[in-house]
């Protein structure tokens, strides 16, 4: 791997302020084709990408997300876990395919495919000089997003991605990640609780200092506090129901 690719990856951060400049159709096609080049489980290609440039549709999706950059961006992508085309194939063969794509394994395969595609899109966009931000907030109301985008059965919106030229006053920066030694386990998983707690405590101190410097002391939250606050929120507990309504996760 060249230093250029490594450095590009290491510089990644979410961009939430964009210039009012739309991506060209040529750029959109290049990004999607870069996404399609990602690895896909068993060549199933269990994904679709909805490109949104209609201001009214963006506005409706913003009402779901609550984020202004759903509208204010160069282009909006919505990444969809998609077994609809596979179901069409199923209608014309003598095999039972539905059991597979309605299963938990089918959900995992689809979600992984979508994630790999989206990261290719993100990396290609950043290589072109654009900024990106993922939009998991579109899952705030999955039923509404499916309605807005006219998604058929077996098609499920996982997340969006806003892409565009970063605004001149955009001042985002990469957040410190967990240390290498804390996420890389050699041969077997290191479940030593004492070592894990010590590593978390050290990382908490680093993150608290990071926020303190970025906000002139207004924020000193630790990573543990941030994680606890998010995971105790009990949000989107209807997700299994919504997956089932889309024909997924039934087995």
Curated annotation (Swiss-Prot):
Pfam families: Nitroreductase. It is an enzyme of class 1 (oxidoreductase). GO terms for molecular function: oxidoreductase activity. InterPro entries: Flavin_OxRdtase_Frp, Nitroreductase, Nitroreductase-like. Its EC number is 1.6.-.-. Reduces FMN, organic nitro compounds and disulfide DTNB. Involved in maintenance of the cellular redox state and the disulfide stress response. Belongs to the flavin oxidoreductase frp family. This is NADPH-dependent oxidoreductase. It comes from Staphylococcus haemolyticus (strain JCSC1435).
């Amino acid at each position: 791997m060249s230093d250029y690719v490594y450095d590009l990856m290491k510089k990644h951060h979410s961009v939430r302020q964009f210039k009012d400049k739309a991506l060209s159709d040529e750029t959109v096609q290049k990004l999607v084709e870069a996404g399609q080049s990602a690895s896909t489980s068993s060549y199933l290609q269990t994904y679709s990408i909805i490109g949104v440039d209609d201001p009214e549709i963006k506005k409706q999706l913003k009402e779901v997300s609550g984020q202004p950059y759903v509208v204010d961006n160069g282009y909006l992508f919505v990444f969809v876990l998609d077994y609809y085309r596979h179901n069409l194939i199923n209608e014309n063969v003598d095999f039972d395919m539905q059991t597979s794509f309605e299963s938990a394994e089918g959900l995992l395969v689809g979600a992984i495919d979508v994630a790999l595609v989206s990261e290719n899109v993100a990396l290609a966009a950043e290589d072109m000089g654009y900024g990106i931000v993922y939009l998991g907030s579109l899952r705030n109301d999955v039923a509404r997003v499916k309605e807005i985008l006219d998604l058929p059965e077996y098609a499920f919106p996982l997340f969006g991605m806003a892409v565009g030229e970063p605004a001149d006053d955009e001042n985002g920066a990469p957040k410190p990640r967990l240390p290498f030694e804390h996420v890389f386990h050699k041969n077997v998983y290191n479940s030593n609780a004492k070592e894990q707690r010590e590593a978390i405590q050290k990382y908490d101190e680093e993150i608290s200092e990071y926020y303190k410097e970025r906000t002139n002391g207004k924020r000193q939250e630790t990573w543990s506090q941030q994680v606890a606050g998010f995971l105790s929120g009990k949000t989107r507990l209807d997700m299994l129901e919504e997956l089932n309504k889309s024909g997924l996760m039934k087995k």
